[in-house]
């Protein structure tokens, strides 16, 4: 019996010990930015020395955005040092309603901001023939100005010190939601979603840096969305999103597939790669350099965060999925980074068995393995990475935004 026990003990001693297993660490925001209404941070851009945030505020005033609310919503942009010190901020608003959704930093250091806006409609006073009868001297309420739908693509150029350099506008026939702005040589590319009644289509539009817009190009007919994109050196882009439409004569494989688009420099749809699983709804929410993509898979009874690294369209290098309560945001730095709300075990983190869904941040290696892992105090709404600053994450607690830095 003793001999058998020693043999069993020897066998267990020879089992590989996960010496490199990741341990979940906690994080703390270096700054907190409070808000009162339904404010949003939509994008983050990093320079070697600063962190640029952009989004939309509905709060009447703010402790970290100068000025007061113009319409029902204003876009904004704010810059912080790598230590979280405020550098400058700018309200991108007027008496109309605006949103700001994406930023891109130009070679001269200026920042291009994409968003959308309304226009104010001033009613024309009714004309009357002669003197109207009004025996009771009733005071008539004047007709009030109203807003058009959110059908204007807004484009702002902001200096590296926070001054407005240019403002341009394109009027769309439909409600518009720009999701991503890219710089391609002398041009700007904006992609996102266009809404008409119950239908949503992806859109692509080019603008020169002097504000000349090309005709808008749309993809899909009823249920196609573009959520993000990256640019290629030849002027083409790779965009990601979802679609339940026929695209390039390829039918959807499920109700809604996650799709990756290759779009030429003139907006021609060249290639579509679909990701699908039977009886699911899928979407890609994010893409970063090196074809790192993040999204989610929705089943009838669960949701998974999906993270895939591709070598080319439809050619995955590695793929991981984790039980989740959200989609996945990704960023490419020295390694791959992903953030989502974890609701189950994560391979490579043996001790991670969350009792409640918890926002996490993962650093992934060349084969998709977990290198380091962190919990976040609130869900992430934006993530970015570069070699100088590291990885920056914006969290949203519902009452304030937090800035988390991993160096």
What is the meaning of each model-derived region?
Residues 1-4:
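Positively charged n-region of N-terminal signal peptides that target proteins for export
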Residues 20-407:
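A sequence-level/structural motif corresponding to short, flexible coil/turn segments enriched
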Residues 7-15:
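Bacterial N-terminal signal peptides
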């Amino acid at each position: 019996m003793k001999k058998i026990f020693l043999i069993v003990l020897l066998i267990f001693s020879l089992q590989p010990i996960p010496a490199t297993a990741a341990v979940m660490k906690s994080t703390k925001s270096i700054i907190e930015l409070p808000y009162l209404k339904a404010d949003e941070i939509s994008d983050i851009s990093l320079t070697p020395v600063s962190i640029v945030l952009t989004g939309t505020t509905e709060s009447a005033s703010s402790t970290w955005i100068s000025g007061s609310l113009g319409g029902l919503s204003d876009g904004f942009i704010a810059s912080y040092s790598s230590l979280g010190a405020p550098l400058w901020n700018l309200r991108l608003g007027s008496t109309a309603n605006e949103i700001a959704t994406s930023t891109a930093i130009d070679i001269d250091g200026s920042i291009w901001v994409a968003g959308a806006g309304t226009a104010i409609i001033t009613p024309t006073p009714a004309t009357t023939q002669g003197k109207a009868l009004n025996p009771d001297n009733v005071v008539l309420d004047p007709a009030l100005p109203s807003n058009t739908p959110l059908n204007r693509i807004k484009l702002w150029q902001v200096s590296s010190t926070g001054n407005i350099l240019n403002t341009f506008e394109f009027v769309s026939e439909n409600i518009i939601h720009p999701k991503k702005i890219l710089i391609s040589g002398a041009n700007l590319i904006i992609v996102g979603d266009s809404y008409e009644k119950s239908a949503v289509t992806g859109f692509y539009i080019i603008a020169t840096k002097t504000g000349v817009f090309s005709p808008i190009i749309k993809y899909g007919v009823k249920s196609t969305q573009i959520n993000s994109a990256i640019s290629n050196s030849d002027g083409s882009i790779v965009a990601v999103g979802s679609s339940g439409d026929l695209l390039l004569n390829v039918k959807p494989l499920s109700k809604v597939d996650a799709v990756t688009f290759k779009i030429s420099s003139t907006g021609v749809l060249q290639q579509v790669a679909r990701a699908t699983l039977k009886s699911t709804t899928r979407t890609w929410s994010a893409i970063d350099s090196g074809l790192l993509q993040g999204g989610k898979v929705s089943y009838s009874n669960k949701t998974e965060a999906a993270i895939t690294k591709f070598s080319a369209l439809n050619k995955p290098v590695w793929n991981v999925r984790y039980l989740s309560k959200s989609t996945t945001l990704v960023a490419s730095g020295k390694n791959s980074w992903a953030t989502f709300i974890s609701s189950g075990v994560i391979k490579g983190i043996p001790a991670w068995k969350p009792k409640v869904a918890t926002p996490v941040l993962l650093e992934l290696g060349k084969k998709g393995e977990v290198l380091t892992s962190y919990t976040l105090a609130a869900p992430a709404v934006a993530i970015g990475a570069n070699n100088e600053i590291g990885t920056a994450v914006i969290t949203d607690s519902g009452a304030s935004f937090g800035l988390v830095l991993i160096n």
